[in-house]
Each structure stands twice: as structure tokens, then as C-alpha cells.
């Protein structure tokens, strides 16, 4: 029998459908008064996953691994980060083009029951995630799950716990394709260092994904087109802190580029686990919603 990890997302489906695969894990309630979020322990010799830690265990890990004041190389982003994925700054989203508005309206969740307001992630959802589509990028980062950076001589690989997805950021000097030969859920990515800032440029994205759920109403998603380009600026400001600036350039959907910023924390006492969207589980859950 699977155990459910309690997460901080509003989408109920994330709690009930996408379950950790390690059946041997057990839940332990936090020790601090009022702290009801459990940690999922992984067993002797194994680390827990970023989303499985409660605040007390996060603080304990920071002390155990001496995160504060630890020496670091600003040009090394290695480590497990999150699970505090950034939310896109919806308040600063520029006006959409007519085509963008058309895409946005099409994401509206359907009203299945009159007594329940429509919400993506619930009944009548249009969220691609509810059908086990890949989250794509940048949603895999803006979502509330951990990720890991691994440096190799000619690339940096970013692994995401949700769905087991990854993206390769090439640092071997290649250029982005002017015309992507094939659209990708995680795009084509090239990176370079500008001082201590890692700059990533991307294009060629599959347009069936969302940037994020529209958190102004929760009933719609933030769309993008296959012409979207991303520019990210990653900067490690301390051993335990990673700052990111994400700029979205999509003239087909948004009238001007827009930028959002965020900070993610190192999780030295964690390692990525499995967190899959299983189509058969998802179908069963969606059927239960309308019974």
C-alpha cells in the first residue's frame, strides 16, 4: 500500500494521485508543537526527499551540514535544491495578445457541479498535468518540488523530482537552433558563465504545457506558444542560497517580455526520490471526482 506525502500545493490531485514509489517509507509527525506536516523517512543510510522534510528537519539538516557560513564555489551549482519552487509573478504579467487571450480562455476549468467552483487540479480541470502530460519548463521549476543540478565537463543537467524529468543545459559553446527541428517539453538549452552568474537561454518548447497555474483565480493556466524563449540568470549567493531571474519572451502570447525572480534553498540532508504521474491512478482519481 502506498503512503501519501503531504505537500503544500493547493491541487488536491497532487496529494492523492502522484504518490511516492518507496512503499517502505513511513510517516513521522513533526516534534514541534503545531507542526503537523510529517516527514517521510527513507531508512538507514538513505536521505529523505526535499518535499518530505518538515521545517524542523530542514533546520536540523542546515545545522548538521553547517550550511550557514560554509565555504562555496559561486560557479558550482551542484546540489539538491527546493522544494520551494518560485511562483511566476502574475501581478506583473503584461497584457496578452488576442491569440494569447484565446489560449488563456481555453484553459478555463469546467463547472462540473454547481455547488463547487471550477478549479484546475480539481473537477473539470483543463490542466495538462491531470492527464499525466509532462510539466515542461519552466513549470517543473515553478512547481513545488525539488531539483538537482549536476555539473559535467560539457553540460549542466537539471533533474526534477516530479515525474523523473531532466533537462540538459549545454555548455560546450553550441548555439540555440534558429528553428527547432522538433519541439521539446523542456526545450533546447545552452548555458554560459558571466562572472559568477550562470546564464541559460532556451527555445523550441512544446506549447501544450503551461507556464504555471494562474494563481489569480486557480481556474485557468498561464499559456505560452512554441515561439517562447527563456533567459535565466542563476547566481549562488551563499553555500545554501540560489537566486534566479527568469525572463519570458513570447511575443505571440504576451505583448512584452516579463521577468520574475525567486530564491531556492539548498537541501543538504535530502536526495531526489520518485514521484510519478501514473495514468491508471490519475484516471481513477478523475473518475472519483465526479461521482
Report the location of each language-model feature.
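Positively charged n-region of N-terminal signal peptides that target proteins for export
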Residues: 1-4
Amino acid at each position: 500500500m502506498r503512503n501519501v506525502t503531504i505537500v503544500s500545493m493547493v491541487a488536491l490531485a497532487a496529494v492523492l494521485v502522484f504518490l511516492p514509489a518507496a512503499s517502505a517509507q513511513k510517516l513521522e509527525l513533526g516534534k514541534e508543537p503545531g507542526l503537523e506536516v510529517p516527514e517521510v523517512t527513507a531508512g538507514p543510510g538513505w536521505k529523505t526527499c526535499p518535499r518530505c522534510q518538515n521545517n524542523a528537519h530542514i533546520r536540523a539538516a542546515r545545522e548538521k551540514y553547517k550550511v550557514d557560513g560554509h565555504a562555496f564555489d559561486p560557479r558550482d551549482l551542484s546540489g539538491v535544491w527546493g522544494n520551494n519552487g518560485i511562483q511566476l509573478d502574475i501581478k506583473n504579467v503584461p497584457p496578452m495578445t488576442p491569440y494569447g487571450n484565446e489560449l488563456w480562455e481555453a484553459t478555463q476549468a469546467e463547472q462540473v457541479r454547481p455547488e463547487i467552483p471550477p478549479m484546475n487540479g480539481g473537477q473539470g480541470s483543463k490542466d495538462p498535468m491531470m492527464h499525466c502530460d509532462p510539466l515542461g519548463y519552466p513549470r517543473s521549476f515553478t512547481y513545488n518540488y525539488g531539483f538537482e543540478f549536476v555539473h559535467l565537463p560539457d553540460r549542466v543537467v537539471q533533474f526534477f523530482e516530479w515525474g523523473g524529468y531532466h533537462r540538459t543545459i549545454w555548455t560546450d559553446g553550441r548555439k540555440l537552433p534558429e528553428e527547432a527541428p522538433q519541439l521539446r517539453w523542456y526545450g533546447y538549452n545552452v548555458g554560459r558563465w558571466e562572472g559568477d552568474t550562470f546564464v541559460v537561454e532556451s527555445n523550441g518548447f512544446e506549447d501544450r504545457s503551461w507556464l504555471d497555474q494562474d494563481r489569480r483565480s486557480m481556474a485557468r493556466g498561464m499559456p505560452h506558444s512554441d515561439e517562447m524563449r527563456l533567459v535565466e540568470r542563476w547566481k549562488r549567493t551563499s553555500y545554501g542560497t540560489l537566486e534566479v531571474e527568469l525572463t519570458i519572451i513570447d511575443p505571440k502570447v504576451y505583448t512584452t517580455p516579463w521577468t520574475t525572480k525567486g530564491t531556492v534553498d539548498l537541501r543538504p540532508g535530502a536526495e531526489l526520490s520518485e514521484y510519478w504521474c501514473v495514468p491508471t491512478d490519475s484516471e481513477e482519481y478523475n473518475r472519483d471526482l465526479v461521482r
